[in-house]
């Protein structure tokens, strides 16, 4: 399968298709859950998940960045893998400047038994990956252990007092 980015310049009345196409050369690799985010510097991040089959027990969040999203011809960085798991919602930037990426690796009890083992059982949670250098490096920070979870879809919100909420649909 492929992921296609379409662009509208008239408020959504029409779209130019194929501004960006993500396609994996391996037909067994699935590309899904795209997400667009403009960071505080105006850089457009296009993220997606890749996995072998439906659930390979690892998945992976990939990104490509466009430094000038208002250009007529969008130029994208080479794709890079930033996290294990799936990211269905946008990152946030906290008041301290940390960039937080909500990801998840589905647990073995999700009803979708992983087809492979990667030693990531300690990451089968609703996770937070963080960057302290504006996205140049990103690492696992922590997780929430949601009872009776299956297909986690999590997001992070910073409250006025600086504490964080993780909202998870499972």
Predicted region positions:
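Asp-box/BNR beta-propeller blade signature and adjacent active/binding-site loops
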Residues: 1-170
């Amino acid at each position: 399968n492929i992921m296609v980015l379409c662009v509208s310049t008239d408020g959504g009345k029409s779209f130019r298709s194929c501004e960006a196409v993500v396609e994996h050369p391996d037909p067994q690799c699935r590309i899904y859950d795209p997400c667009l985010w403009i960071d505080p510097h105006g850089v457009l991040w296009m993220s997606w998940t890749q996995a072998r089959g439906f659930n390979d027990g690892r998945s992976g969040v990939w990104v490509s960045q466009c430094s000038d999203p208002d250009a007529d011809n969008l130029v994208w960085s080479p794709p890079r893998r930033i996290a294990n798991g799936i990211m269905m919602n946008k990152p946030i930037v906290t008041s301290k400047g940390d960039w937080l990426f909500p990801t998840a690796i589905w647990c073995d009890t999700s009803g979708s038994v992983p087809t492979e083992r990667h030693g990531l059982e300690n990451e089968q949670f609703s996770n937070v990956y963080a960057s302290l250098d504006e996205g140049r490096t990103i690492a696992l920070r922590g997780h929430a252990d949601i009872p009776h979870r299956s297909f986690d879809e999590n997001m992070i919100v910073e409250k006025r007092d600086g504490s964080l909420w993780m909202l998870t649909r499972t």
